[in-house]
Amino acid sequence: MQETSATITAERKHSHVDVCLNRPVCFDGQDTGLDAWRFEHNAAPEIDFAEIDLTAEFLGHAIGMPLMISSMTGGYGDALALNRTLAEAAERFRIPLGVGSMRQALEGNSHRESFSIVRSSAPSVPIFANIGAPEVAAGLSREQLSTLVELIEADGLIVHLNPAQELFQPEGSTNFRGFLDRLHDITATINVPVIAKEVGCGISAPLASKLADAGVKAIDVAGAGGISWQKVEECRYLDRFGNEERFSPSALDEFLNWGIPTAECLTGIAALKEKSPEYGSLAVISSGGIRNGLDVAKSIALGADIAASAQHLLKALRAGTLEETIRTWANDLRAAMFLTGSATTAQLKHAPIYRKP
């Protein structure tokens, strides 16, 4: 029974990557909102472009630039090579890496190496384990979660919140009752920091405060504007069941594009942290449609500590341009810092940025 469950999960993980790489699954009803913001130009930056420092700190770890390779994959055969390449890039650029959902590793042993490969390939950078909110709500034990952390020698645990994805997923788990209480139990007992992450619909400031109260140390907003996991699962549903309708046609488009834009998540949480000092230490990751280093720079100025990307970097990996893409993004970021007079990423946090009229 366990191996059957593990096989089903592995097949789903493979399907997810295939759909994300080959089907039109990005939001088309709204964007990240980052394009609505512009930096104030500094015509006398008083810094040397060659000396701009991209290094940053995240959850106590020094990193090479404020970018994370976001949670994408693992738990099936082909994922081993993908995760090895992603981890090697993370190590080369000294940036964090999150693995995809590790549910399959709890269901069977067949593809555990697709996860464990990341630590052997990236021995010195922060790596984060990953499990879903439905599994947490269902009562995963501290021991089970510790097993996932130990498997990849993780520096933290990502708990992904994905109600819209689960709603659309043919095999979805839609019982989230008791999640916040279970989350609090986990953060109080597990020996690594916990990150709460959406998968593309965003996290509001009120929810961020509840998650922080439950003990999470960081929020990955994963806002609307990048991949719509509703669209990913709708593709899989239609492939399996044809055009059998689940939702009213007049409502479906809004559901497929449901979510809070990334920039709106960032500004909301920044306002929360400014208003309520008890949330001041909450780290923030900007993800959901991050396309380049300028998006990273805007994210930092809008309140994020780092940004993260999944699909863009996975597509670059497939094209053989992963490291070139990361270098280009670093140069984008450096250019934005130069033109705002920000010699460090800490200074970039205070760079003037305005909503376009």
UniProtKB/Swiss-Prot annotation:
GO CC terms, sorted: cytoplasm
Q: Name the enzyme's class.
A: isomerase
Name one process (GO BP) from the record. Answer: isoprenoid biosynthetic process
Gene3D superfamilies noted in UniProt: Aldolase class I
**One Pfam family hit:** FMN_dh
Matching InterPro entries, A to Z? Aldolase_TIM (IPR013785), FMN-dep_DH (IPR000262), IPdP_isomerase (IPR011179)
Q: Which cofactor does it need?
A: FMN; NADPH; Mg(2+)
The GO molecular function terms of this record are: FMN binding; isopentenyl-diphosphate delta-isomerase activity; magnesium ion binding; NADPH binding; oxidoreductase activity
**SMART domains this protein is in?**
IMPDH (SM01240)
Say which domain of life the source belongs to.
Bacteria
> Does Hydrolase show up as a keyword for this record?
no
**Entry keyword set:** Cytoplasm, Flavoprotein, FMN, Isomerase, Isoprene biosynthesis, Magnesium, Metal-binding, NADP
Predominant location: cytoplasm
Positions binding Mg(2+) in this chain are: 166
Annotated residues for binding of FMN: 70-73, 101, 130, 197, 289-291, 310-311
What family does this chain come from, according to its entry? Belongs to the IPP isomerase type 2 family.
Q: Which HAMAP family match?
A: Idi_2
Q: Extract the NCBIfam families matched here.
A: IPP_isom_2
Assembly:
Homooctamer. Dimer of tetramers.
> Briefly, what is this protein's role?
Involved in the biosynthesis of isoprenoids. Catalyzes the 1,3-allylic rearrangement of the homoallylic substrate isopentenyl (IPP) to its allylic isomer, dimethylallyl diphosphate (DMAPP).
Protein name (database record): Isopentenyl-diphosphate delta-isomerase
Q: Which organism is it from?
A: Chlorobaculum parvum (strain DSM 263 / NCIMB 8327)
